[in-house]
UniProtKB/Swiss-Prot annotation:
Its EC number is 5.1.1.1. It holds the Pfam family Ala_racemase_N. Catalyzes the interconversion of L-alanine and D-alanine. May also act on other amino acids. This is Alanine racemase. It comes from Xanthomonas oryzae pv. oryzae (strain MAFF 311018). The keyword Isomerase applies.
Length: 366
């Protein structure tokens, strides 16, 4: 079988959730949308459920996958519902929903629910994506709070630039949210991963950690808090061929790398169809049997090439680590002009293996 594999450390996942709880000083919904950022929503939710306050997903399809797998904890639909018929499923499966548009508010007000629903009312405080204007937000709260089909309301907003620690936008959003929500008796939710890791003055009742759960740093530099994150995914493959190139010979499409010395080249079973960044530059580091080696040549659909010249002991079958504890996915993403979110979510055909911890053997493969 092809040797590319992503190893998922479930104990690291639990560690990062506990860190989010500690930094937030509040309840926390573990965000497992997009298949838990490429880590597998069901096994990640199963690992976290004994201690998680709940989960958050993008849409009802993702929530139903968790319910069908036996997850009983609260699940919030971050985009709410797209069709009125989904409200019946929300009630049937005891889901929580965001209300972020006037249409969703009207639908909730008209819905004769068989059980009261828990609704998260979302205000647009400056993201200008989903969310009610401050005026509509207050009007929606007044409209929904007394209805029998509404069990409770949580007031939420989303930070647009919290990953920029020197940007005033986060403070501006927090002030706008506080001014509008002032006097409304309800729990609040404001902090996402960068809000938890980089903005300690922010306070809320519910945090929504996403990227940080998986051990990735949302900032371009390390901080005291991000240094405590543990990478959850380790992406590995193996060398499938070794060849020697003389001076002047190129490697790969477009001859982006030309040997300036006699070069020992390792071909690795990993390409952009697996989710490795296609435009990773020459010199991007990987680990070959624990030794740093530079990527050379253009990344192909199914393969990439590395320079083994300085590590003559490396041969066919050597383990190649593309990201994990080293190299970290965040710096790799920056080097390749993509985001860590994109890399983690992009592993479409790489099989995942789940381990209880980095020091414990494999427990399951999916």
């Amino acid at each position: 079988m092809r040797p590319a594999q992503a190893s998922i450390d479930l104990e690291a996942l639990r560690h990062n959730y506990r860190l989010a709880k500690r930094l937030g000083g509040s309840k926390a919904l573990a965000v497992v949308k997009a298949d838990a950022y490429g880590h597998g929503a069901v096994p990640c939710a199963q690992a976290l459920e004994p201690e998680a306050d709940g989960f958050a997903v993008a849409c009802i399809e993702e929530a139903l996958e968790l319910r069908q797998a036996g997850i009983r904890a609260p699940i919030l639909l971050l985009e709410g519902f797209f069709e009125h018929d989904e409200l019946r499923l929300i009630a049937e499966h005891d889901l929580w929903t965001v209300a972020a548009t006037p249409q969703q508010v009207r639908a909730l007000a008209a819905f004769q629910s068989p059980r009261p629903l828990r609704v998260w009312l979302k205000m647009d405080s400056g993201m200008h994506r989903l969310g009610l204007s401050p005026e509509d937000f207050r009007a929606a709260w007044l409209r929904l709070r007394g209805l029998p089909q509404i069990a409770s309301l949580v007031l939420m907003t989303h930070l647009a630039r919290a990953d920029e620690l020197d940007c005033s936008r986060t403070d501006e959003q927090a002030v706008a949210f506080a001014l509008t929500a002032g006097g409304m008796r309800a729990e609040t939710s404001l902090r996402n991963s960068p809000g938890l890791l980089g903005w300690p003055a922010l306070r809320n009742d519910w945090s929504r950690p996403g990227l940080m759960l998986y051990g990735a740093n949302p900032f371009p530099q390390d901080t005291e808090n991000t240094a405590q994150l543990r990478p959850v995914m380790t992406l590995r493959s193996r060398i499938i061929l070794v060849r020697d190139l003389p001076v002047g010979e190129p490697v790969g499409y477009g001859a982006r790398f030309v040997a300036e010395r006699p070069t020992r080249v390792g071909v690795v079973a990993m390409g952009y169809a697996d989710g490795y960044p296609q435009f990773a530059p020459n010199g991007t580091p990987v680990l070959v049997d624990g030794q740093v080696c530079p990527l050379i040549g253009r990344v192909s659909m199914d393969m990439l090439t590395v320079d083994l010249t300085d590590h003559p002991q490396a041969d066919i079958g050597a383990t190649v680590q593309l990201w994990g504890q080293a190299p970290r996915v965040g710096p790799l993403a920056t080097q390749c002009n993509v985001s860590a979110y994109q890399l983690l979510c992009g592993l479409k055909r790489v099989p995942r293996t789940y381990v209880a911890s980095a020091a414990v053997g494999e427990v399951a493969a999916r």
